[in-house]
From Swiss-Prot:
Function field: Succinyl-CoA synthetase functions in the citric acid cycle (TCA), coupling the hydrolysis of succinyl-CoA to the synthesis of either ATP or GTP and thus represents the only step of substrate-level phosphorylation in the TCA. The beta subunit provides nucleotide specificity of the enzyme and binds the substrate succinate, while the binding sites for coenzyme A and phosphate are found in the alpha subunit.
Lineage: Bacteria, Pseudomonadati, Pseudomonadota, Betaproteobacteria, Burkholderiales
Domain ATP-grasp: 9-244
HAMAP family: Succ_CoA_beta
Native organism: Burkholderia ambifaria (strain MC40-6)
Subunit composition and interactions: Heterotetramer of two alpha and two beta subunits.
Keyword field: ATP-binding, Ligase, Magnesium, Metal-binding, Nucleotide-binding, Tricarboxylic acid cycle
UniProt cross-references to Pfam families, sorted A to Z: ATP-grasp_2, Ligase_CoA
Protein residues bound to substrate: 264, 321-323
Name listed for the protein in its UniProt record: Succinate--CoA ligase [ADP-forming] subunit beta
Cofactor(s) it depends on: Mg(2+)
One GO CC term, this protein: succinate-CoA ligase complex
Length: 388
């Protein structure tokens, strides 16, 4: 789960991390009111969307008068903001953050992630803040410094000081940087975050260290422990299809292709998508119905996939372990009839009650294309999507 910048800064503030004064605004008049409350002479008007690259896309403006705050708020609020993370369709801006201006001298980067290779929490830092860290990592990996943090000890003073020095924090400002890094770690740990990022971390002309941005991602499996984080959820920023899928306990992620995938098990789902791509196709979605799929869930899964206007074919790939193939067959038949399926459907089933499931499909009268192997299924669905 992602949250907005202003929400991330609320979290940082709770953990003692220095951030500029600012508030969210949901209208132009409210933006002006916030600016007047903060006082001048400089304000930053920021679009609030769940994507990076807002500045390059025109979603961050520096205002030097209340009139400019109104002008920029009017420009940004409601705009379709396109960044390298939104895709060409962009994301509509429904919220702003109005913040006091900052004396920017040195922009740094710091973040915390869970490293899958070491299975540890890793603190990363770079002297190249205020830009795309992915680009820095690709072109200048030597500028990315990493510290492995042991959960039993937390981020030690020496570790924080060492990283701060390596990324260029002046010696006199290292105690401030240490407090920010340790506060960021505590926020990451105590909220079950999967990412906590400050970009940029600013060192001002007088040596003050302050977080000018905040980005958090949270482990959705841990949200039951954090109702205060769930309260930050903004459904306007999420894919409507993914929201609908969650109501039926379906793991669904929209993709850019034209071949729908309905699979049981995340591993098999990823292997299915890889095999489709191997034979020249493009998956339209990741969809895991899980081990306890019912006829209703399968029907809803079909409805979700068919809402995609680019859909050209569907592949159902089932391994019947806990899940019985006859139950899936029943759902496929009911779902196909309920939605008046009008795209080619390829079905491959193996495992528990496989023969019964195949017989049910064969007797259904539906134009279902059967396959015995995953490779055969992928080849057939790619051909069907291409109209062959």
């Amino acid at each position: 789960m992602k949250i907005h910048e202003y929400q991330g800064k609320e979290i940082l503030r709770k953990f003692g991390v220095a951030v500029p004064r600012g508030k969210p605004a949901f209208s132009v008049d409210e933006a002006v009111k916030v600016a007047e409350e903060l006082g001048g002479p400089v304000w930053v008007v920021k679009a609030q969307i769940h994507a990076g690259g807002r500045g390059k896309g025109g979603g961050v403006k520096v205002a030097k008068s209340i009139e400019q705050v109104r002008e920029y708020a009017n420009q940004i609020l409601g705009m379709q903001l396109v960044t390298h993370q939104t895709g060409p369709e962009g994301q509509k801006v429904n919220r702003l953050m109005i913040e006091e201006g900052a004396d920017i001298k040195q922009e740094l980067y710091v973040s915390l992630v869970v490293d899958r290779i070491s299975q540890k929490i890793v603190l990363m830092g770079s002297s190249e803040g205020g830009m795309d860290i992915e680009e820095v990592a690709e072109k200048h990996p030597e500028l990315i410094h990493k510290v492995i943090v042991e959960p039993s000890t937390g981020l030690l003073d020496a570790q924080a000081d060492d990283l701060a020095a390596k990324i260029g924090v002046p010696a006199a400002s290292i105690p401030q940087a240490r407090a920010i890094l340790q506060g960021l770690y505590k926020a990451f740990w105590e909220t079950d975050a999967s990412l906590a990022e400050i970009n940029p971390l600013n060192v001002s002309g007088d040596g003050k260290v302050i977080a000018l941005d905040a980005k958090f991602n949270f482990d959705s499996n841990a949200l039951f422990r954090h109702p205060e984080i769930v309260a930050y959820r903004d459904l306007d920023e999420e894919d409507p299809a993914e929201i609908e899928a969650s109501k039926f306990d379906l793991a669904y992620i929209s993709l850019d292709g034209n071949i729908g995938c309905l699979v049981n098990g995340a591993g098999l789902a990823m292997a299915t998508m890889d095999t489709i791509k191997l034979f020249g196709g493009e998956p339209a979605n990741f969809l895991d119905v899980g081990g306890g799929a019912t006829t209703e869930k399968v029907t809803e899964a079909f409805k979700l996939m068919l809402k995609n206007p680019d859909l050209k074919a569907i592949l159902v790939n089932i391994f019947g372990g806990i899940m019985r193939c006859d139950v899936i067959a029943e759902g496929v038949i009911a779902g196909s009839k309920a939605v008046n399926l009008n795209v080619p459907l390829v079905v491959r089933m193996k495992g528990t009650n496989e023969d019964l499931g195949k017989k049910m499909l064969a007797d259904s009268g539906l134009p279902i294309i059967s396959a015995d192997s995953m490779e055969e299924a992928a080849q057939k669905v790619v051909a069907a999507a291409a109209g062959k």
